[in-house]
Regions:
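N-terminal non-catalytic accessory region
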Residues: 1-146, 150-206, 311-315, 324-483
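Secretory/organelle targeting and membrane-embedding segments
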Residues: 165-343, 347-360
Length: 483
């Protein structure tokens, strides 16, 4: 079936990427500022000057298309697959991508790039202006918004605060928080440890980005405002908005207060039919215990993880309370928009499978599963430790001890800047073994290939509870910088 064919062009689709998912460039020189890793590696002495242009505000920066060419590591925030895979999937399904003149009988898809640094109010307003231009091109047809992460936030702002409910018929929100992510506070407090690839750390890339992020109004708008996720060592709730001395400057604290105000203004109203696709069963930062020093200053935070999320956004925040349809998948925040199971559901919904009543699809409801590797980056030849925990949660939680788990390392793509790299001849495969001391926990190890690149660590889980389940975790193989 070709989903993009339509007897009438009664709507068009807009892809709204998430945080850091749009390219940014200098308006005057047209130089890509975010992010051209090959260019940075060719001229590392220029990295600091290039990145400084990202400091907000800087009106000489403009969006220049969506991230559509390579995987982006921004740890500990997320491992982001590129949106080109989503666009190509829709093209293969018969949709028309970014047409100058729409073809009758074809449903058009428009990727929307925006400056993700700026206040999400402004991004939502600009999205509205562009959607209305596209409506004119389509004789008044309404938009269907497919939005990932922060893209869902600006989509909701457009719909609820900029009159967009007259322009939008459906919203499809993928891993998009309505009540932020604790990881935003973790990044603001501790910074990034890897951005792009490890080699860039030699030039202070991660530290520079960590400094710049504190100047972005939008990042403070990703902080949870309803869920009290922080406590002191005395188990007292810690209000990070009232006690804002964890931030270094008065400007940072003003941005924090405006982030709170933004979310209070946006609220939880949904004026158009909304579908939530969300990830679960991934180790996700959901809470933190803060050690306080003199004057209530934060000394350190012990972050707590559970499987109730996609690795970045807690499940509670990714499931909008007013959404009519909700679909859960065992996926990461950074690949929810390209995962095969999610795309199958999206195809169904875009083909007209939407219901008017509340509809919920939940996978793994009777299976507690956690699959992970011990690191995100490995050197060639290094041992990759893999584990998976399985529990039957009906009627009560019991470890599953008779499962079979087959794990393989599947080539995904070269590291940024190494586009000529080719996949290894035979990636490793193993079967995980039951841990004799931990019922329900399966462990194993394999050797990272000598070929640098990005790989999917893929596990096929065989249990008696349901049909075979495939889960993945993305890792990178890269030599130690300077080694």
């Amino acid at each position: 079936m070709v989903f993009g064919d339509s007897s009438s062009s009664d709507h068009f689709i807009v892809i709204v990427p998430g945080y850091m998912g749009s390219l940014l460039r200098d308006k005057n020189t047209k130089e890509t500022i975010w992010i051209d890793i090959p260019a940075m590696l060719r001229n590392p002495a220029h990295i600091d000057d290039t990145l400084e242009k990202l400091r907000y505000p800087n009106e000489d920066i403009e969006p220049a298309g969506i991230m559509d060419k390579s995987v982006l590591y921004v740890l500990p925030w997320a491992k982001l697959d590129h949106y080109g895979r989503l666009i190509e999937h829709l093209r293969e399904e018969g949709f028309e991508i970014n047409p100058e003149t729409p073809t009758p009988g074809k449903t058009a898809v428009y990727p929307y790039a925006y400056d993700w640094r700026q206040d999400n109010r402004l991004s939502g307003r600009q999205l509205g202006e562009t959607v209305r231009d596209w409506r004119q091109k389509h004789n008044g047809a309404k938009a269907w918004l497919v939005a990932h992460s922060n893209g869902g936030i600006i989509s909701r702002w457009f719909v609820e605060k900029e009159g967009g409910k007259e322009d939008v018929e459906h919203m499809f929100l993928m891993g998009s928080p309505w009540d932020g992510s604790p990881k935003s506070v973790r990044v603001l407090f501790e910074g990034y440890n890897i951005v792009g690839r490890r080699l860039l750390n030699l030039f202070g890339f991660n530290k520079k980005i960590s400094s710049l992020i504190r100047s972005f109004p939008s990042f403070y708008q990703l902080i949870p405002y309803q869920n009290p996720f922080l406590r002191t060592e005395d188990n007292e709730v810690l209000d990070l908005f009232t006690n804002a001395n964890w931030l270094e400057s008065e400007q940072d604290r003003q941005l924090l207060q405006d982030g709170l105000k933004f979310n209070q203004e946006l609220g939880t109203t949904l004026s158009v039919h909304t579908v939530c696709y969300f990830g679960r069963k991934k180790p996700t930062t959901t809470a933190g215990v803060v050690s306080l020093g003199v004057g209530g200053k934060w000394k350190e935070v012990r972050w707590l993880e559970t499987g109730a999320g996609d690795g970045t956004i807690p499940e509670r925040s990714a499931v909008h309370p007013q959404a009519k349809e909700r679909h859960a998948f065992a996926v990461d925040h950074g690949n929810i928009y390209v995962h095969e199971d999610v795309l199958t559901q999206l195809d169904f919904d875009l083909a007209g499978g939407l219901g008017g009543l509340e509809f919920v699809t939940v996978t793994l409801d009777n299976l507690s599963l956690e699959f992970d590797a011990n690191e995100d980056f490995y050197t060639p030849g290094e041992t990759v430790q893999v584990y998976c925990t399985l529990k039957d949660t009906t009627p009560e939680t019991n470890p599953i001890t008779d499962a079979r788990l087959e794990v393989s390392l599947v080539w995904k793509e070269p590291l940024p800047g190494d586009e000529d790299a080719s996949p290894p001849v035979q990636p490793p495969e193993i079967s995980l073994k039951q841990d004799a001391n931990e019922p329900g926990t399966y462990r194993g190890s394999l050797t990272a290939p000598m070929q640098e690149g990005t790989y999917n660590l893929r596990a096929v889980v065989h249990t008696n509870l349901q049909s075979d389940l495939t889960v993945e975790e993305m890792i990178a193989v890269e030599a130690e910088p300077g080694g």
